[in-house]
Amino acid sequence: MFLLYSALITLLSPIIMLGYLRRIRQGKETRALAGERFGTQLETPPSGRDVYWVHAVSVGETVAAKPIIRELRKARPDAWIVLSTTTLTGRDVASKVPGVDQVIQFPIDFPWCTSKALRTIHPKLIILMEAELWPGFIGTAKRMGTPVAVINGRFSDAKLTSWLRFRHLLSPAINGVDLWLMQS
């Protein structure tokens, strides 16, 4: 299923790129951060340090990630903590979160973007805040042997129905998660 998703997302990449360019024109993305979204202009964490990658989509998820990052920093004071966001407003908030060593834009879910980003960051663990599941990213992480945890996730009946409709395409993401810490 990972190959099917990768083929489909690659086939749709011209349309997705047009949407990305539109977001730049609307001010929802910035050209200066395009390299991060494509996984090419990322700082390599220092060697010899465990890397933990926390992904929070926007402001709400970033705020929810603060206690996780605080406890992670207490438990692993020498770790390198990367916090990624998808939105510019989330990035602004993320840049002020104590204990974070690196703030980046989350890579677009194209196979070449996610694999480049994951090879550069090389995390020991990926923590996804809420149920923000990207099949390409999670599938690539699994192929690299990186565990993935979803924290603070919620599934409404509507979301579950939607996911079930696309379960064949989403199975790499769902099956790739090692730990689910969900809200009821």
Please name every model-derived segment:
Residues 1-19:
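Membrane-interacting alpha-helical segments
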